[in-house]
């Protein structure tokens, strides 16, 4: 149904337009997107004729600062916080509204010699400031346009226009597919663009390394930062893991209540300790401690989920009641850390098949699943049964 990101990039490099859809739980819209560097009056005319929406120009903060483009409003109450600047027309234009003059304004916006005084305010082109980090920080069309431009090696600016049906309603995916077919346009999703960037870009940085003596043995501890969500993670490495043989690995998601306070609601603390002990016994391996509290929903939301469980919901139902998926974790950052450690082939300590699939999706080979089942307690029996029945965990209960 959708095209690959690589296909869209090739068309954009040729000055063509693509359609980009966002999530159905967000705006659930599609936009025409083109590279600002290659914009022509013909492309503008196509957008306003067949898109019928507002023509905007996503740019970086640097463009806005250089051209002194102030925010359109001092207090942004838009539900998605779209960062409109004041609208502009280039001083060489007349009314500024024609396709030709809108293209001129966009071309001059990209001109490195242009100054803020070269543009009249307000005008008919609406610059939008993309967030630093692009779609990895905000999954909007603004960020998608700038990301696509960067991936094409072009100036970091795009031209976008919402697609509206002839009857005035917003075009949804079935309508957008018809539009793409009619005009032979590639169609991609922001979700796929996020996945593409996560797969192709290095988002982790090795920050510090120390020797860490523990009750289970002495480990080489390596601290990592990441540019995706700014969370900090730590890898505990034992022995020589550079032999090329499959390495015993545990990817452990942070659980403050279980790991630190010894909560009996889950089996996280015992799993953490058992994994460290097993790696120590083998003489080599990695425990990767990921800051993904509560399967990614955070500490306070996990406590809220616990409250709902006290009222009768199970762990999956509680997450969903709070508006979260059953499991919000993404293994891309963890996979990048494991690759930074030089690993390609793993023996994974886990009961969770989704974790195996998540890591394999980033080109890591899992040669063996090593079970890590802890004794069941009365307090976590229902929790473990739900993980087995609803999340697919491989447990003998």
Swiss-Prot record:
<comment type="similarity">
    <text>In the C-terminal section; belongs to the GTP cyclohydrolase II family.</text>
</comment>
<feature type="binding site">
    <location>
        <begin position="293"/>
        <end position="295"/>
    </location>
    <ligand>
        <name>GTP</name>
    </ligand>
</feature>
<keyword id="KW-0342">GTP-binding</keyword>
<dbReference type="InterPro" id="IPR017945">
    <property type="entry name" value="DHBP_synth_RibB-like_a/b_dom"/>
</dbReference>
<feature type="binding site">
    <location>
        <begin position="138"/>
        <end position="142"/>
    </location>
    <ligand>
        <name>D-ribulose 5-phosphate</name>
    </ligand>
</feature>
<keyword id="KW-0464">Manganese</keyword>
<feature type="site" description="Essential for DHBP synthase activity">
    <location>
        <position position="124"/>
    </location>
</feature>
<feature type="binding site">
    <location>
        <position position="141"/>
    </location>
    <ligand>
        <name>Mg(2+) 2</name>
    </ligand>
</feature>
<feature type="binding site">
    <location>
        <position position="266"/>
    </location>
    <ligand>
        <name>Zn(2+)</name>
    </ligand>
</feature>
<keyword id="KW-0378">Hydrolase</keyword>
<keyword id="KW-0862">Zinc</keyword>
<feature type="binding site">
    <location>
        <position position="355"/>
    </location>
    <ligand>
        <name>GTP</name>
    </ligand>
</feature>
<dbReference type="InterPro" id="IPR000926">
    <property type="entry name" value="RibA"/>
</dbReference>
<dbReference type="GO" id="GO:0003935">
    <property type="term" value="F:GTP cyclohydrolase II activity"/>
</dbReference>
<dbReference type="InterPro" id="IPR032677">
    <property type="entry name" value="GTP_cyclohydro_II"/>
</dbReference>
<dbReference type="InterPro" id="IPR000422">
    <property type="entry name" value="DHBP_synthase_RibB"/>
</dbReference>
<keyword id="KW-0547">Nucleotide-binding</keyword>
<dbReference type="Pfam" id="PF00925">
    <property type="entry name" value="GTP_cyclohydro2"/>
</dbReference>
<feature type="active site" description="Nucleophile; for GTP cyclohydrolase activity">
    <location>
        <position position="329"/>
    </location>
</feature>
<keyword id="KW-0686">Riboflavin biosynthesis</keyword>
<keyword id="KW-0460">Magnesium</keyword>
<feature type="active site" description="Proton acceptor; for GTP cyclohydrolase activity">
    <location>
        <position position="327"/>
    </location>
</feature>
<feature type="binding site">
    <location>
        <position position="162"/>
    </location>
    <ligand>
        <name>D-ribulose 5-phosphate</name>
    </ligand>
</feature>
<dbReference type="GO" id="GO:0005829">
    <property type="term" value="C:cytosol"/>
</dbReference>
<keyword id="KW-0511">Multifunctional enzyme</keyword>
<feature type="binding site">
    <location>
        <position position="315"/>
    </location>
    <ligand>
        <name>GTP</name>
    </ligand>
</feature>
<comment type="function">
    <text>Catalyzes the conversion of D-ribulose 5-phosphate to formate and 3,4-dihydroxy-2-butanone 4-phosphate.</text>
</comment>
<dbReference type="GO" id="GO:0030145">
    <property type="term" value="F:manganese ion binding"/>
</dbReference>
<feature type="binding site">
    <location>
        <position position="271"/>
    </location>
    <ligand>
        <name>GTP</name>
    </ligand>
</feature>
<keyword id="KW-0479">Metal-binding</keyword>
<dbReference type="GO" id="GO:0000287">
    <property type="term" value="F:magnesium ion binding"/>
</dbReference>
<feature type="binding site">
    <location>
        <position position="27"/>
    </location>
    <ligand>
        <name>Mg(2+) 1</name>
    </ligand>
</feature>
<dbReference type="Pfam" id="PF00926">
    <property type="entry name" value="DHBP_synthase"/>
</dbReference>
<dbReference type="GO" id="GO:0005525">
    <property type="term" value="F:GTP binding"/>
</dbReference>
<comment type="pathway">
    <text>Cofactor biosynthesis; riboflavin biosynthesis; 5-amino-6-(D-ribitylamino)uracil from GTP: step 1/4.</text>
</comment>
<feature type="region of interest" description="DHBP synthase">
    <location>
        <begin position="1"/>
        <end position="199"/>
    </location>
</feature>
<comment type="similarity">
    <text>In the N-terminal section; belongs to the DHBP synthase family.</text>
</comment>
<comment type="function">
    <text>Catalyzes the conversion of GTP to 2,5-diamino-6-ribosylamino-4(3H)-pyrimidinone 5'-phosphate (DARP), formate and pyrophosphate.</text>
</comment>
<feature type="binding site">
    <location>
        <position position="255"/>
    </location>
    <ligand>
        <name>Zn(2+)</name>
    </ligand>
</feature>
<comment type="pathway">
    <text>Cofactor biosynthesis; riboflavin biosynthesis; 2-hydroxy-3-oxobutyl phosphate from D-ribulose 5-phosphate: step 1/1.</text>
</comment>
<feature type="binding site">
    <location>
        <position position="268"/>
    </location>
    <ligand>
        <name>Zn(2+)</name>
    </ligand>
</feature>
<dbReference type="InterPro" id="IPR016299">
    <property type="entry name" value="Riboflavin_synth_RibBA"/>
</dbReference>
């Amino acid at each position: 149904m959708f095209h690959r990101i690589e296909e869209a990039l090739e068309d954009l490099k040729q000055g063509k337009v693509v359609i980009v859809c966002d999530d159905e739980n967000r705006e659930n819209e599609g936009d025409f997107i083109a590279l600002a560097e290659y914009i022509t009056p013909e492309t503008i005319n196509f957008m306003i004729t067949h898109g019928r929406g507002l023509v905007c120009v996503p740019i970086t903060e640097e463009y806005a600062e250089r051209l002194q483009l102030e925010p359109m409003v001092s207090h942004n109450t838009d539900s998605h916080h779209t960062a409109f600047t004041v609208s502009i027309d280039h001083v060489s234009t007349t009314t500024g509204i024609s396709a030709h003059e809108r293209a001129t304004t966009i071309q001059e916006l990209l001109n490195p010699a242009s100054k803020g005084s070269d543009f009249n305010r307000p005008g008919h082109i609406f610059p939008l400031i993309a967030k630093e980090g692009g779609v990895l920080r905000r999954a909007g069309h603004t960020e998608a346009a700038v990301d696509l431009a960067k991936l094409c090696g072009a100036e970091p600016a795009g031209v976008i226009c919402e697609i509206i049906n002839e009857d005035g309603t917003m075009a949804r995916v079935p309508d957008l597919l018809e539009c793409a077919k009619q005009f032979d346009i590639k169609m991609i999703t922001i979700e796929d663009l996020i996945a593409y960037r996560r797969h192709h870009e290095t988002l982790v940085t090795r920050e510090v390394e120390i020797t860490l003596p523990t009750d289970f043995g002495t480990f080489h501890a390596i601290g990592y930062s990441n540019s995706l969500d700014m969370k900090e993670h730590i890898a505990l490495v034992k022995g020589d893991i550079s032999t090329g043989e499959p390495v015993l690995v545990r990817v452990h998601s942070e659980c403050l209540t279980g790991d630190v306070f010894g909560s009996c609601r889950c089996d996280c603390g015992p799993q953490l300790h058992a994994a460290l002990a097993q790696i120590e016994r083998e003489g080599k391996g990695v425990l990767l401690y990921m800051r993904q509290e509560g399967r990614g929903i955070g500490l306070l939301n996990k406590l809220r989920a616990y409250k709902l469980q006290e009222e009768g919901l199970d762990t999956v139902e509680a997450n969903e009641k709070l508006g979260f998926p059953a499991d919000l974790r993404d293994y891309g950052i963890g996979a990048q850390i494991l690759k930074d450690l030089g690993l390609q082939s793993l023996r994974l300590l886990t009961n969770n098949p989704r974790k195996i699939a998540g890591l394999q999706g980033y080109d890591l080979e899992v040669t063996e699943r090593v079970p890590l089942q802890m004794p069941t307690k009365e307090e976590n029996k229902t929790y473990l049964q739900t993980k087995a029945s609803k999340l697919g965990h491989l447990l003998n209960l």
